[in-house]
């Protein structure tokens, strides 16, 4: 099936849309930082990094960011993350060498956590350290540690993914879902919600099973949406190694179009469960937790809006196109309104545990 033949259904997402009112001004500062950042070595790289429109992305996650500086530096991590993903994870010299990537990931993570660490071997490392220094300047120690843990989780998932690719191994759907919760990079942006708003969620709230389930479900919905967003570009480039569609095709024998339909049904069932658990948890939440839960909602919707327009996914040429500002079409109802846990996915079946609703 060719790129033009695949039919991607509209996204079901009846959640609130919002964007920080000063996102455009903040992005001007972000792009100036990119122009001088050591993570980019050519003008073409800088152009494609800017084409991720990462301030627009995170301004939709945190439309209530407390200050422009908080939005700037959290958005700059998103710019950094997409660039690192493109040049060190999905492509480049580490993309099929798990041992080499694991060593790089260890150095990157230590540089994030230790302000005294020095490593000039890769331009991404000093760029990340500059961002981390700003996080420490305005975040609480706990917020910074939570972000570091989320960052480590992401790198572990990417290592898992690269290991599969190097071995020519296609995971089953249950394993893929477990891996994608990490490798999709959803943990760091949601951990940055606290850094952006300045509100620290008490540990007894953030670590509650229902809240952890909501965080994981938000990550999974966004991850499956990103598989959708990137499908046409991956088909055009022949890079369909590990996404939800290739996994379903391998496991079930479905053709691509039917795999798209099956993945859409799974995604919508997760979103419906997210909404049900959210509506039980939110009424009793204090300010900090309520703000975080709203951030999860903003993040799901914002990721969908951004992904449907961003040149990172839509541009197939060597030069990115402008941001697509055309009106978006949304599905009016879910592709599957079954409220039970999907079969064959024990790794996430606990999201449907009735105990989560006993808040």
Swiss-Prot record:
A motif (DDXXXD motif) lies at residues 85-90. Pfam families: Terpene_syn_C_2. Its cofactor is Mg(2+). The keyword Metal-binding applies. Gene3D superfamilies: Farnesyl Diphosphate Synthase. Mg(2+) 3 binds at residues 226, 230, 234. Signal peptide: none annotated. GO terms for molecular function: metal ion binding; terpene synthase activity. Its EC number is 4.2.3.158. It catalyses: (2E,6E,10E)-geranylgeranyl diphosphate = (-)-spiroviolene + diphosphate. It is an enzyme of class 4 (lyase). Substrate binds at residues 180, 233, 312-313. Keywords: Lyase, Magnesium, Metal-binding. Mg(2+) 1 binds at residues 85, 90. A motif (NXXXSXXXE motif) lies at residues 226-234. Binds 3 Mg(2+) ions per subunit. The keyword Magnesium applies. Belongs to the terpene synthase family. PANTHER family: BETA-PINACENE SYNTHASE-RELATED (PTHR35201:SF4), TERPENE SYNTHASE (PTHR35201). Catalyzes the formation of (3R,6R,10S,11R,14R)-spiroviolene from geranylgeranyl diphosphate (GGPP) via a 1,11-cyclization and a 10Re,14Si-cyclization. The Asp-Asp-Xaa-Xaa-Xaa-Asp (DDXXXD) and Asn-Xaa-Xaa-Xaa-Ser-Xaa-Xaa-Xaa-Glu (NSE) motifs are important for the catalytic activity, presumably through binding to Mg(2+). This is Spiroviolene synthase.
